[in-house]
Swiss-Prot record:
Organism, scientific name: Ureaplasma parvum serovar 3 (strain ATCC 700970)
Keywords: Cell membrane, Membrane, Transmembrane, Transmembrane helix
Claim: tRNA-binding is one of the keywords in the record: no
Protein family (similarity comment): To U.parvum UU008, UU041 and UU042.
Full protein name: Uncharacterized protein UU007
């Protein structure tokens, strides 16, 4: 244990920082970020796949949300699908917040960005937690909000139809469709 502490205190990390102004950017990164902290190829691949998956999930409900807001037709939509999708993506948003905030370097990352300081984008926590977490927060929050918008429209139409003693489809045909100014709705 004492040997490890001596190696840390005598590491070239601290001496490299004092000579940082005289070095090129590439050498500076190699000296300041030890090889043990750099992201592995598998970490980067996992991050890329999770970001792609997050973007696809985030955009999956958007077309239906736009169509529902334009046409107000919710009769053929599944209430349970949008409820479960909204809840699941809300929890994934919380998971993204956890990924970003759980690592001790997260606070220093935010402070360094605010102060315009150099960010070590090759570190494991950036590839494994930060990038994935930021995309999860943005993407899944979008998906959750759009799912709950469609769910709200569906429940609203169901309640109004029930008050009038109609099915949701009849309510749409008699109360909503005649007043829509959407091309193809009438």
């Amino acid at each position: 244990m004492l040997n490890i502490l001596n190696n840390v205190s005598n590491s070239s990390l601290y001496s490299a920082a004092s000579n940082a102004t005289a070095q090129t950017g590439s050498n500076l990164i190699n000296d300041l970020v030890p090889e043990t902290l750099t992201a592995s190829g598998i970490s980067i691949a996992i991050s890329v796949f999770s970001v792609i998956g997050t973007i696809v999930i985030a955009l999956s409900v958007l077309p239906q949300t736009i169509k529902t807001l334009r046409e107000k037709d919710t009769a053929s939509l599944s209430l349970l699908l949008f409820l479960l999708n909204g809840i699941a993506t809300a929890f994934l948003t919380l998971y993204g917040i956890g990924l970003v905030t759980v690592h001790p370097n997260s606070f220093s990352f935010l402070v360094d960005i605010k102060n315009g300081m150099f960010i070590y984008n090759r570190e494991e926590w950036v590839a494994g937690y930060l990038i994935c977490g930021i995309f999860l927060i943005m993407g899944e929050a979008l998906c959750s909000v759009t799912s709950f918008i469609v769910l709200f429209c569906k429940v609203n139409n169901m309640i109004k139809a029930k008050k009038m003693g109609m099915s949701e489809e009849e309510y749409y045909e008699k109360q909503i469709k005649p007043f829509l100014k959407v091309k193809g709705a009438n």
